[in-house]
Amino acid sequence: MSGHSKWATTKHKKAVVDAKRAKSFARLIKNIEVAARTGGGDVSGNPTLFDAIQKAKKTSVPADNIDRAVKRGSGAEAGGADWQTIMYEGYGPNGVALLVECLTDNKNRAAMEVRTAMTRNGGSLADPGSVAYMFSRKGVVVIGKEGTDLTEDDVLGAVLDAGAEEVSDQGDTFEVISEATDLAAVRDALKAAGIEYDSAEASFVPSVEVPLDAEGATKVFRLIDALDDCDDVQNVFANYDVSDDVMAALEDA
């Protein structure tokens, strides 16, 4: 959900892209540290760490940075932070529900950053539980199509018996949805079938979506961008639905 550099002015676009790249690297490194701390530094016995490292590699995070993150997380090297996961709930423009996942070593700073981003961009924080019920914790695997002749049936055939609930064609990728507890089985089934995937992680999938026109989408994307720019924010999950026609109009604007 990060990106949307189209909202930046041309003058500042490169600086924005560079900053977002650095932010993306920092997020991925945090994920590796936490995975190593939780399940140990051996990827053969820690599928969460394996997936975090694979995602970092695909995003071109330097190997040295990855190795150091594993060592910090597993305790083999000093310097790891005491990361805590905090989830904030809120509403954006047009009543779009938001879950904001933070990974932070300072709860007060994270709360202030999220609250400021919300209030300055037409959003508001909500009481715990008032938004979360609109989302389900799911396993989400993204499979790139580039350089392959994979079909939706190929992917479905590989994962059907592993607990996959849905396989959808997203244009440049296929997306496999499962229960979060079946994520490892789906990932292993894809490996067994020789199908490479771009990412495999637990996510929050909305049960009901709010359709947005161009004006509403512009406001919601700006809020998501502002949240995304907060140092402690790892992920933003939202229940909006923007049609292909609206997205095309925004990209041409």
From Swiss-Prot:
The keyword Cytoplasm applies. This is Probable transcriptional regulatory protein Krad_3057. GO terms for cellular component: cytosol. It is found in: Cytoplasm. Keywords: Cytoplasm, DNA-binding, Transcription, Transcription regulation. GO terms for molecular function: DNA binding. Its main location: cytoplasm. Coiled coil: none annotated. InterPro entries: Integrase-like_N, TACO1_YebC-like_2nd/3rd_dom, TACO1_YebC_N, Transcrip_reg_TACO1-like, Transcrip_reg_TACO1-like_dom3, YebC-like.
